[in-house]
Design a protein with these regions (language model features):
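Conserved catalytic core of the tyrosine transesterase superfamily
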Residues: 1-262
Length: 262
């Protein structure tokens, strides 16, 4: 059995703008697969059998298949293999699930109990919909009078209007210069994991930074009913992903039918 050692593949991913987190995830699946099968000689049957792991949820299985698909796309182009053994594997269906947004009282509780820096981080998630990595890497150069320029997944950039709640603290951050949230060395950015933990500690009842992103999406959608705008603000490549963020509860469904009936 072989272990994973294809630095050229990692370079290929980096050149394509794949984030460090995604690269690490893909390599972890490839390492696990290579402990059971040689990557250069694995067959379609080997891959299907490995993906049948009964302990995996559909989302895990989909991520594992995606990692193998990515590797064999490169391997075929690089002539490491003669054919792609993942080509005949079936896509994994993952049922969509609505993720709950943090309630407003959880947000208010968090904002009351933290210092200015953590308060700004929380508000960037709740009032700009930024991911934890996007918050961690925010630089003064990304801040304009009315807009933020955000670099998200896949190194894609988007522009997000600055909510009135964010105007003053972001203006101060702009004046200070450099990264808004700095690490222990005083100049480089904090890590995404550290940022996520910092926000989660401030929130009650096990809510997370991601639930604040849902809070932002839900409020923007309810105010505008413009799902395309929400998609752009969140930086989603697929509107199907945005639909998970804009789950409509039963009360809203009743109001919609009631409005038509009246």
């Amino acid at each position: 059995m072989s272990s994973f050692s294809f630095p050229e593949y990692v370079s290929w991913l980096k050149a394509g703008g794949v984030t460090a987190g995604t690269i690490a995830l893909r390599i972890s699946y490839l390492e696990r697969f290579s402990r059971a099968h040689d990557l250069c000689t694995a067959t379609t049957e080997d891959i299907i059998g490995w993906l049948e792991n009964p302990e995996w949820k559909p989302a895990t299985r989909m991520s594992a298949r995606s990692s193998l698909r990515s590797f064999y796309k490169w391997a075929l182009e690089a002539e490491v293999v003669e054919k792609d053994p993942t080509a005949r594997t079936r896509p994994v269906k993952v049922p969509p699930r609505a993720i709950k947004e943090a309630p407003q009282d959880a947000l208010l509780t968090a904002l009351e109990g933290v210092g200015e820096r953590d308060r700004l981080a929380i508000m960037l998630a709740a009032y700009a919909g930024l991911r934890r990595a996007e918050i961690a890497n925010l630089h003064a150069d990304n801040i304009e009078d009315r807009m933020l320029t955000v670099t998200g997944k896949g190194s894609r950039t988007r522009r997000v209007p600055i909510h009135p709640m964010l105007a003053a603290p972001l203006r101060e951050a702009k004046e200070r210069g450099g990264y808004v949230f700095r690490g222990a060395d005083g100049w480089s950015p904090v890590t995404a994991d550290a940022m996520g933990r910092r926000i989660a500690r401030a929130l009650p009842d096990h809510w997370s930074a991601h639930s604040l992103r849902h809070y932002f999406a839900g409020n923007v959608y309810r105010a505008s009913h413009d799902i395309r705008a929400v998609q752009q603000l969140l930086g989603h490549s697929s509107i199907a992903t945005t639909q998970i963020y804009t789950h409509i509860d039963d009360d809203e469904l009743h109001r919609a039918v009631g409005a038509w009936a009246s």
